[in-house]
C-alpha cells in the first residue's frame, strides 16, 4: 500500500511540475495572475478535495460493504459449505502470500463475488448465495482466486489513488474554465467579482471532464480485471478460471441474469460487471469472451 502511495505521490509531483511548466510556456500564468487566480493554491485545494473523498471511501470500504449487503462474516463455520469456503480462501491467501482476509456471504440471487478493504492486510472477500448455488467448487475456487489477486495486487488502493488524481484535475480544470467563461462574458465593471458565468462554466465543465475521467478510470479497471484473471489462473489453475467465466457467461446470457446494485461503488470490484453496450467505454469489466480468450492464450 505504502509503495503505491509513494509512487502516486511522485506522479502527482511530476504532474504538478509539468502543469506549471505548461502554464508558464503558454504564458497562462500572466493571464491567471491578472485575474487574481493563484493557480498553485487552486491546485493544492483541488488535490485536497479530489483525494479526501477517495481516501475516506477506501478507509470505510469494508464497513460500507457489510452494511450495504448485510454480509454475514464467517467467524466460525456453521456448516460444511462455510467451512469449505473459509478453507479455500485461506489456502489461496497462503499461496498469494497475503494475510487471510475476512470471508463473508451475502444474500442475493446475483452470481458474483467481490473483494474490498483498505489494504492487503485488512480486506474482505464476500460471495453471494447465488454463486454458491449455481457454481461448482472448482468454479468458485477460480472466482475466489480472482478476488484474492485483486487484494494481492492492491487494486483497491490503486483505484482509490487513480480516482483521486482524476478528481483533482476535474476540480482544478473546471474552476479554471469557470473563471475563463466568467471573464469572457462579464462587463469590465463586473470583473472584480465572480459572476454567474463562473458557476455555469464550472458546472458544465465538471460534467464533461467528469465523464472523461470516468472513461479513464473504467479503462484502468478493465485492464485490472485481465490481471486479476491471470492471477486467479495462477492460484487456482487456468481451467478453474476459464470454467468460472464460461459459467458466468452462460448465466448472464440467460433469463436469470442479475446484477445486485445495492452498492454501485463496489461493482468495479466484483468478478462480473454489467455489460457495457453502447457505453462500453464506461464498463468496469471487459466482455467475458475477451477475458476467456486472454486466459486461453496463457501457456499451460
Curated annotation (Swiss-Prot):
What Pfam families does the record point to? Peptidase_M48
Instruction: Name a single GO cellular component.
Output: plasma membrane
Q: Biological process GO annotation list?
A: proteolysis
Keywords for this entry? Cell inner membrane, Cell membrane, Hydrolase, Membrane, Metal-binding, Metalloprotease, Protease, Transmembrane, Transmembrane helix, Zinc
**Note describing how the cofactor binds:** Binds 1 zinc ion per subunit.
Its Enzyme Commission number? 3.4.24.-
**Molecular functions (GO terms):** metalloendopeptidase activity; zinc ion binding
Please list the residues that make up the active site. Answer: 147
Q: Which cofactor does it need?
A: Zn(2+)
Domain of life here? Bacteria
Judged by the first EC level, this protein's enzyme class is hydrolase
Protein location: Cell inner membrane
Q: Where does Zn(2+) bind?
A: 146, 150, 225
Its membrane topology is listed as: Multi-pass membrane protein
Membrane-traversing stretches? 5-25, 41-61, 161-181, 196-216
CDD domains, alphabetized: M48B_HtpX_like
Where does the UniProt entry say this protein principally localizes? membrane
Name the InterPro entries on file.
Answer: HtpX_protease, Pept_M48_protease_HtpX, Peptidase_M48
Q: Which family does it belong to?
A: Belongs to the peptidase M48B family.
User: Would you tell me the protein name for this molecule?
Assistant: Protease HtpX homolog
What is the species listed in this Swiss-Prot or TrEMBL entry? Answer: Methylacidiphilum infernorum (isolate V4) (Methylokorus infernorum (strain V4))
Point out the gene that encodes the protein. htpX
